[in-house]
Amino acid sequence: MTRGAWRCIIGWLICIGGTPVASVAQAPETAVVMLGTGTPNADPDRSGPAVAVVRAGRSYLVDAGPGVMRRASAAAALHADSSLQPRNLRILFLTHLHSDHTVGLPDLILSAWTLERDVPLEVYGPPGTQAMVDHLLAAYAADIRNRIDGLEPANPTGYQVRVHEIAPGKVFEDGNVTVTAFAVPHGDWEVAFGYRFQSADRSIVVSGDTRASDAVVRACDGCDLLVHEVYSAERFQTRPPAWQAYHAKAHTSTTELADIARRAAPKQLLLYHQLFWGTTDEGLIAETRAAGYKGPMRSAADLTRY
């Protein structure tokens, strides 16, 4: 790649608010890498929802949307972060079981194994997670047996999954980060979660899919970074009535997010899972500003680091 091309890539990362690899040394020890910022819409520039919290050589994933493995590999190279290499993807937290947040799960189970992960994948999620994993392993049973019993030098443990079906409260602690799950309202799902990650140097909250909720305000409460989903309030009226009814119950508008963020008071607000409907990153930020939020705010793109 030419020097000019690299300058273009670094300039693009700076413009959308992320951190290029040259600046990683100045970043906090605990960082967020946006592996996927998309929605069910087939946007070629945005993979499905997947957020990585990285610290001290370990990675912790929130959701596994389509494309998660390839985005993680790309991020590992771009940010010189070995914790995002396939064999080191070992811990996953699922917010809920919608397909756009879980289609990458079999990839995370099986591809990371074939690329030398030799420990079981730890998956934390709502009730139903165990059944999903059981069905996935059954679906790929022939593949697994072929790799283990055939000529391929596959290890016997890396495809295994340890599922932890969780309830709100502290769900994980390893001396590096502490993870707390909190319930959020998302459409017709009986159980959906957001997550708060607390480390020695930073507090990070990932909303997951949710309509405007005081639970996010309580979980953040002045956190360092709030990663929150959003849709365009201005473009909402262009949607068919049935979709308007759904989105109003399942997601958070720019107008609503302005109020949530004002009360949650994060040091930085990061938009993701953006439903643009014809607007832009700048448009979403402008809508949120117009609704009264004045704090630091960015709109995330895939592969950016914060």
Name what the model sees in each region.
Residues 1-5:
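N-terminal secretory signal peptides that target proteins for export/translocation
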Residues 25-205, 216, 283-306:
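Binuclear metal-dependent hydrolase catalytic cores
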Residues 7-20:
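Bacterial N-terminal signal peptides
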Residues 194, 201-203, 211-304:
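Cap/insert and terminal regions of metallo-dependent hydrolase folds
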